[in-house]
A protein has these predicted regions:
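Short solvent-exposed strand/turn elements
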Residues: 86-102, 305-325
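Short beta-strand and beta-hairpin "edge-sheet" elements
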Residues: 20-21, 64-91, 166, 281-312
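Amphipathic, non-transmembrane alpha-helical segments in extracytoplasmic/periplasmic proteins
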Residues: 39-40, 75, 91, 104-128, ...
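A generic structural motif
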Residues: 38-41, 85-91, 174-176, 265-267, ...
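Acidic, small/polar-enriched beta strand-loop surface segments
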Residues: 2-10, 163-305, 315-330
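Short beta-strand-centered interaction patches in the first periplasmic/extracellular domains
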Residues: 86-95, 129-198
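Assembly/oligomerization scaffold segments
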Residues: 1-97, 189-196
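Extended Gly/Ser/Thr-rich low-complexity repeat segments
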Residues: 50-63, 100-108, 278-283, 323-330
Length: 330
């Protein structure tokens, strides 16, 4: 299985290539979770026929796929039964330091990217590229998880500029916040890499009208999807528009995020570029599911010499919208 390499490193810097001891490996992520995860089933016979593996909790895990490092994290769980010749390991990347640490911050007139860089510096979390938003925000976070702060800061930016953002850790273990793409560089198609496709359609959470009010209760205007309302009935959401602001972009984004949900579950040949947040061009007219999609969740699996992916695709470009903290002065 030479298309990947799994390495364990001790705190002292000793490194072990354990690739040949792996029977099954999965590498997964989601737009709803900042951490990517590794799960590995390792051969650890009880008869001493193989050397013991350095599977101590906290040891560093590195995964390289097709020659490029894709994951840097640590072992967080280890499981072995007395009647089993395997050990199961779970590793999480450095996103767990964002979700597992809480902070107390007040940001006023600050660009989200500057705020994120500052809080990461306080906690020693490496930072790579952070998307520039062109806006400033104000928010108080009294005892809030750092991951929620990051997503909340960029959610506020998205409400102003209409863009979509994703926070994740790259293969070097650095936090990056990227603007989600509007075009696809990857393609999934029959007779190329597509194996199976299942389509799910859902209107159980539909909201197709947004009424914009002032904070005194005066209706400013209503933004709606008339075609959806005619087909399924009207379901209304309320937005409060503050003085000097225009909630039009936020209202339009709400309609897009809460319209008819059509998701696809795809199994395809493995490609390390098929990770959550990226865009793909899906071509499969037989299931009436074709066009530009975004990956909401991904699981990459290596087993029995095979490498394949299971993806959750969405025709809507979603971000992990998060409301955290409170307004300054409250």
């Amino acid at each position: 299985m030479g298309d990947y390499q799994l390495t364990i490193l001790s705190p002292q810097g000793d490194a072990w290539d354990v690739t040949e001891r792996v029977s099954t490996l999965s590498w997964s992520g989601s737009v709803k979770r900042v951490s990517r995860q590794i799960e590995a089933v390792m051969a650890t016979p009880n008869d001493g026929s193989l050397p013991e593996l350095p599977c101590d909790l906290g040891n560093e895990l590195r995964l390289s796929v097709q020659g490029a490092q894709r994951f840097l994290g640590h072992i967080v769980t280890r499981e072995k039964a007395t009647d089993s010749s395997t050990t199961e390991l779970t590793g999480l990347d450095r996103g767990r330091f964002l979700s597992g640490n809480e902070g107390w911050y007040t940001f006023s007139g600050t660009a989200p990217e500057a705020a994120v860089r500052a809080l990461c510096a306080d906690f020693g979390i490496p930072v790579g590229s952070l998307a520039e938003t062109g806006v400033q925000v104000a928010r108080k976070y009294p005892g809030v998880a750092l991951s929620k702060m990051v997503d909340s800061l960029y959610t506020m930016a998205a409400e102003q500029n209409g863009k979509r953002y994703l926070s994740r850790f790259n293969g070097a273990g650095e936090l990056e916040v990227v603007e989600k793409p509007e075009a696809a560089a990857l393609e999934i198609a029959p007779r190329k890499n597509l194996q199976t496709l299942r389509v799910t359609e859902d209107i159980s959470g539909l909201q197709n009208a947004v009424a914009i009010y002032t904070d005194t209760g005066r209706l400013v205007r209503t933004v709606s999807d008339g075609e959806s309302a005619a087909l399924y009935g009207q379901f209304q959401h309320i937005l409060t528009q503050r003085d000097g602001e225009d909630a039009g972009a936020e209202a339009q984004a709400w309609l897009e995020d809460n319209g008819l949900q059509q998701t696809m579950t795809v199994e395809c040949l493995g490609d390390p570029a098929l990770i959550s947040g990226n865009a793909v061009l899906l071509r499969d007219n037989t299931a009436q599911a074709a066009g530009l999609c975004w990956i909401d969740a991904d699981t990459h699996t290596w087993k029995n010499g095979q490498y394949f992916c299971r993806l959750t695709l969405n025709f809507r470009n979603l971000m992990n919208e998060t409301a955290a903290g409170r307004e300054i002065g409250r």
